[in-house]
Amino acid sequence: MALHVPKAPGFAQMLKEGAKHFSGLEEAVYRNIQACKELAQTTRTAYGPNGMNKMVINHLEKLFVTNDAATILRELEVQHPAAKMIVMASHMQEQEVGDGTNFVLVFAGALLELAEELLRIGLSVSEVIEGYEIACRKAHEILPNLVCCSAKNLRDIDEVSSLLRTSIMSKQYGNEVFLAKLIAQACVSIFPDSGHFNVDNIRVCKILGSGISSSSVLHGMVFKKETEGDVTSVKDAKIAVYSCPFDGMITETKGTVLIKTAEELMNFSKGEENLMDAQVKAIADTGANVVVTGGKVADMALHYANKYNIMLVRLNSKWDLRRLCKTVGATALPRLTPPVLEEMGHCDSVYLSEVGDTQVVVFKHEKEDGAISTIVLRGSTDNLMDDIERAVDDGVNTFKVLTRDKRLVPGGGATEIELAKQITSYGETCPGLEQYAIKKFAEAFEAIPRALAENSGVKANEVISKLYAVHQEGNKNVGLDIEAEVPAVKDMLEAGILDTYLGKYWAIKLATNAAVTVLRVDQIIMAKPAGGPKPPSGKKDWDDDQND
């Protein structure tokens, strides 16, 4: 009989062999804080217009060169459970606002770093948490008073482009004026009267070659495809969309046919040809002059399409088919039947064009109220275009936020310093031990202008003391001047560097929640990982169409 080895007494004897558990301040809380600090330190250097790029190679060996925190975190696949909570908070920020993910990380990291100092002094975790929650509520009370202006007219391209400039600046510093104008044109052209703006209605088509300044906006959709038949341009297009292959419906029968004469050979496939001819003619008779199909196109069907002057476009992606249906107002038909008038889509012109050396099919809507707008991006490398696409995404999301709430607060660290100043003076009035946590919460706001200053290569302490001095005089809108070679400050409202109110509101809320959640953990219990080989960690979604 095998010798029985007794387990160590205590918590471990209840768990299966191989399980790990950590408890108490030293093992659990400080370790978690350390992991979150490391994560915040990674993305902190990418904060702001002068932030550095990160080169990330993911598990599929795809290369990303970007300073967009959301992309960096998504591709890093963070394993540490506490750091994962902060990553989740930044994902929530991306879903809620679409921008400000790095703010959440930097701020949450600063909160936890300062919480560690308080815990080492001897405060209890519950006192730190209570202080942080009081300070967060206070920050949300102060924030509406810091609003410096509101968007007046979201249908004015010049005004919208000036408001989008700040969010694009942090991703594409130097190209922000041109890109903001492009995005403003695209957003304003499809902004419905109801005021419900859908970010999916702005499409991006990336075409290699030329430079960023050759990018343009089109009302309608652009596909990197070629037409199948001879017809390459149609004006006043009536469009029939099919989700099935453009082919005859013939049952596959196995059998041997004995053909004795040439006439029999001629007649053998005539019935099939006549049927195909009748089908294509029926479609042409409805007035449809463009057919878009989601499957393969048979040679015979192509021949008859050319005969009846029908333009044929093949889209492999079901997502593209859906978006096209939405753009032109068509219904995708599952069988090759002639469409009725309601099922056909309309647009002003469909034509084959060449951008650089890439063939594209353009479905153009001249009307200003087209359902979908496409930004055609040009760039010298794929990585550059991917990064510009992320900047466009941020710009479009900022426009969406402005349609929900038009209020704006000053950027460049001005809002953060004002919040820090007011929350510190509020902390002085609190009698309990929470006042230390409230003051540290205020100090955490300094991490934002500090990161901006460090990334711009100026002395952070000097900048922050200058900002405090100016804010003490009552200039709420003064922030860091990142373009100056020396530590300098300027009025953000005059410079046009503005952040959305909602973006700041949610970022403070989510960062505080994440930090408090991490602090609340006092035990980590990890079961032994299941044995056996790990499944291949390839792409989660086998249907790759949505990325086309």
Swiss-Prot record:
The modification N-acetylalanine is found at residue 2. The modification Phosphotyrosine is found at residues 30, 505. Mg(2+) binds at residue 99. SUPFAM superfamilies: GroEL apical domain-like (SSF52029), GroEL equatorial domain-like (SSF48592), GroEL-intermediate domain like (SSF54849). It catalyses: ATP + H2O = ADP + phosphate + H(+). Component of the chaperonin-containing T-complex (TRiC), a hexadecamer composed of two identical back-to-back stacked rings enclosing a protein folding chamber. Each ring is made up of eight different subunits: TCP1/CCT1, CCT2, CCT3, CCT4, CCT5, CCT6A/CCT6, CCT7, CCT8. Interacts with PACRG. Interacts with DNAAF4. Interacts with synaptic plasticity regulator PANTS. This is T-complex protein 1 subunit theta. The keyword Chaperone applies. It comes from the Eukaryota. There is a cross-link at residue 459 (Glycyl lysine isopeptide (Lys-Gly) (interchain with G-Cter in SUMO1)).
